[in-house]
Amino acid sequence: MSGKPPAIFLMGPTAAGKTDLAIELTTVLPCELISVDSALVYRGMDIGSAKPSKEVLAAHPHRLIDILDPAQSYSAAQFRADALEAMAEITARGKIPLLVGGTMLYYKALIDGLADMPAADATVRAELEAQAEALGLAELHRQLAEVDPESAARIHPNDPQRLIRALEVYRVSGESMTAHRRRQFAESRGADAGAGGHLPYTVASLAIAPTDRHILHQRIALRFSQMLEQGFVDEVRSLRARSDLHAGLPSIRAVGYRQVWDYLDGKLTENEMRERGIIATRQLAKRQFTWLRGWPEVHWLDSLACDNLSRTLKYLGAISILS
């Protein structure tokens, strides 16, 4: 192993069983957990985010859960700063940071650093927002596909915040967001060619998912139905009652929350809300798989295997991450 301290990434699509395996690992390894999930950072968003229960969190604390109010935004840059601080504290106590979650952009921000993007431009942003209002998001997505096809392929056509930001970067700088990120990636590898790039840790990357995609789809549908039974609609209703929350916020645009919000707005029937929530979650899982297919040196585990703990320990021993 290199002179860097170890860290473990436990990644995977939604509903794959990441949290259960992470908790198992903490019982046999000197690990402390850091959540890597853009929805779990929000207080009061428990059911729809599949947040671990209060009992689980009390027994197995996770950093970066319940750190923000839903009215606030949280960026990859903020996550990187918070995660690095938590990792340093954990390492200083002789423990191993175990990062668990499915927000792949956050993992990438940790590994590669963040591209030096142009600052927001209020005039350009107002113009793009006016276009979105007048012409629709599909037109903005078409424009983005012309100047930055890679970002267009990655950004959902109904994600106004990311669409507008990608077009804003291009209009302000004359260079696509993809080009900015490629340059930053090259610089990070040049600055530190070791594992982790800008990240001062030796990272073991694990990913867990069912080998049969149909099984994952069944899990997603079952979990969404269970969320509804547990009071997901009432949870969103309480958020909707707040005057400072609206459908344009990143928290409310989270998968599931957006669909239930639309249902409470009368835009969807209950059946439509359920179906669209499941579809949106499946689409999220597909995007997570896309990220993971390009992830270097990732060790895959089958969610359905009964010996994932021993398989994980064997792998970590084989790459000497624990020595």
From Swiss-Prot:
PANTHER family: TRNA DIMETHYLALLYLTRANSFERASE. The record marks T103, R125 as: Interaction with substrate tRNA. Keywords: ATP-binding, Magnesium, Nucleotide-binding, Transferase, tRNA processing. It catalyses: adenosine(37) in tRNA + dimethylallyl diphosphate = N(6)-dimethylallyladenosine(37) in tRNA + diphosphate. It is an enzyme of class 2 (transferase). This is tRNA dimethylallyltransferase. InterPro entries: Dimethylallyltransferase, IPT, P-loop_NTPase. The keyword Heme does not apply. Monomer. Belongs to the IPP transferase family. ATP binds at G12, P13, T14, A15, A16, G17, K18, T19. Its cofactor is Mg(2+). One of its GO terms (biological process) is tRNA modification. Substrate binds at T14, A15, A16, G17, K18, T19. It comes from the Bacteria. Residues 37-40, 161-165 are annotated as: Interaction with substrate tRNA. GO terms for molecular function: ATP binding; tRNA dimethylallyltransferase activity. Its EC number is 2.5.1.75. Catalyzes the transfer of a dimethylallyl group onto the adenine at position 37 in tRNAs that read codons beginning with uridine, leading to the formation of N6-(dimethylallyl)adenosine (i(6)A). The keyword Nucleotide-binding applies. Pfam families: IPPT.
